[in-house]
Amino acid sequence: MFGAEVDVDLRAPVDGETIAAVRAALNEHEVLVVRDQDLSGDDMLALGHAFGELLCNPFSPSADDAPELIIFDNHDENPAALTDVWHADETFRAEPPSVTMLHSLIAPSLGGGTMFASMRAAYELLSERMKAFIEGLTALHDFGRFDGLFPNEPDARARLHQIELAHPHPVHPVVRVHPETGRQVLYVNRHFTRRINELPEDEGAALLEFLLTRPSMPEIQLRVDWRAETLVMWDNRSVQHYACHDYYPQRRRMQRVTVAGDRPVADTPPPPRSVQRVVVPNPPEQPEAASVPRRRVLRPFERTGGEVPVS
């Protein structure tokens, strides 16, 4: 079943048995929703580190003292940018993220939900002939859509060039194999996939556009409606998401960490391990989150002094 709501307390410290159970549930359900999680920034960092190394996103606003902790604080005076598109996170990397964790600090009373689509299901719903046709194809990925975040001035363009050098347009399989479950996944997205390498430009563009529409099928979707202190974790290797920009002028403040992954491959790994359903206790009731003042959070490249983190 795609998506699950689970009861577990993920405030630090979290023991290894709980982490293993959550990881198993994530492999099975792809998206996990955990309500009533009073998580500080340090809690988010600790939880992310329990799953692996954390990445810094050079295009997203982050905490001043922790570039791995992304802060989204959006409202009518600071609308979100480039998130209302179906995408997987950061496939412009040679080794894209494995898991994304997003936690709500302030949630709108209406709207502001996040849509998710299972690209495992998207692949499975293709015809056998289409599966055979796209087998072995590869695609170029880059972050060209984000160039507009950088003003046309020397310092900003120099920072952009620094990021380009760190992430030189990787090639990923159109169909990747999940390294833990062994399931095949359709692995192209509208944010970062530019072209299919093995086809003429016109044929590749037509095929790519068809594949890019697959997340729009309601049969493979779910929607999470946020309320304060909700944590959502998803498998970035097999899930795409879309942030709904339908809540202005209300405010939506979120914190996010992104766990490093491995290089996507098309070869089938050994048979997957069995997955156990998670049974965890209900968390204790948490106090209401304190109000947070409005202050635009800076992206790494907007800060002065020091290099842009590009890990």
Each language-model region and where it sits:
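Non-heme Fe(II) oxygenase catalytic core, chiefly the N-lobe of the double-stranded beta-helix
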Residues: 1-231, 236-311
